[in-house]
Amino acid sequence: MNLQHHFLIAMPALQDPIFRRSVVYICEHNQDGAMGIIINKPLENLQIEGILEKLKITPEPRDSAIRLDKAVMLGGPLAEDRGFILHTPPSRFASSIRISDNTVITTSRDVLETLGTQQQPSDVLVALGYASWDKGQLEQELLDNAWLTAPADLNILFKTPIAERWREAAKLIGIDILTMPGVAGHA
């Protein structure tokens, strides 16, 4: 089972404060573990423009049609001071990894320097921090019914309003997660 380019959708019974009602986009999954970015937990009072200001990056030439007031996500509990930018191709940046044909993750400053300009990738999600699972840990959490999985959908990743991503991700697999009981059993 390889869940790269899939969503993990927190089951209603998952009460961990970071992962409760979360949707995690899995960037890497192999025999050594998994790494992902939470895509629906906005950091309070932090938008892309605030990150650019803190890093003293001024978009030039600025394209006023591109919004920089989008929320920055809490990507996970690890390395919360480190930025991860999920975006659509191209992957011409210094530190980019292609996750799928349509999704790239970049951790280098050069992608930030394109935000707000015509060179910016068409779709962008900025996160601080990431989530990680050791070898076999994610598989065990799946067996314990902590998560649902669904193939990733770019509309949910980049365009669906943040507050609706949990429910919309579950709908990908035909589930209205708001009607699920808090605890699921094994079939």
From Swiss-Prot:
Source organism: Salmonella newport (strain SL254)
PANTHER family: UNCHARACTERIZED PROTEIN YQGE (PTHR30327), UPF0301 PROTEIN YQGE (PTHR30327:SF1)
Similarity-based family: Belongs to the UPF0301 (AlgH) family.
Pfam families: DUF179
Gene: yqgE
Entry-linked Gene3D superfamilies: VC0467-like, VC0467-like domains
GO cellular component, one term: cytosol
Top-rank taxon: Bacteria
Database matches in InterPro entries: AlgH-like
Protein name per its UniProtKB record: UPF0301 protein YqgE
